[in-house]
Amino acid sequence: DLDKAKIGYLPASTFKIANTMIGLETGKIVDENMVFKWDGVKKAVPIWEKDLVLKDAFQFSCVPCYRELARNIGFQDMNAYLAKLKFGNMQIKEHSVDMFWLAGESTITSFQQIDFLQRFYEKKLPISDRTHQIVKKILLLEEKESYKMSGKTGWAIQDEADNGWFVGYLETGENVYY
C-alpha cells in the first residue's frame, strides 16, 4: 500500500538497529560480547529475565536493555547521532531519551526505513567499519546456501492502533531486496 508507506509511525523496536549503532559508536556498547545484566526484577517478557549478550538482547527485542542503553548514551549524544544517521523524524527530549521510539511523536515511514537500511547495507552511514560489521552480524536472521535474510521486528500502539514492523533485507547472490 503505497499511501500507507508514506505515513510515519513509531519505529518501535526497529530503532534497536540505530540504537545499537549509536551505542557502539559512543563506546557504551564495548563489543558484540557485551552483556546486559538482568536486574532481578520480573519483566513483561520472561526471556528478558536473564543476562543477555548483545545479539540476544537485540533478537529477543529486550526493551529494558535498550532503554538502559539509551540512558547510558544520554540525550546529547543520542540527539547528535540521530541527526547524523537521519533515521526518520525522531522527537527526542531529555526526559524521553529512553522511550521516544516507543511512545510520543517520533515517526518513520516505510520508505525511510528502506532508505536507512539501504544506506547501512551500502556503507553510506557515518559509522565505523567495526560498527557496521557488528550490526550486520546481529541483524542476520537466517543464512542458507541461496540467500541471507537480515532484519528486525517492531510493534507499538499509536492512536489506539497496533502497528507492526518487519524491516530488513534479503541477499540472493548479487541482488539485495529491502
Regions found by a protein language model. Give the residues of each.
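A conserved catalytic-loop motif detector
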Residues: A103-G151
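Active-site SXXK
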Residues: G8-E32, A57, Q113
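Active-site-proximal alpha-helical segments within enzyme catalytic domains
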Residues: I17, A57, G104-K123, G164-Y178
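Beta-lactamase-like hydrolase cores
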Residues: D1-G8
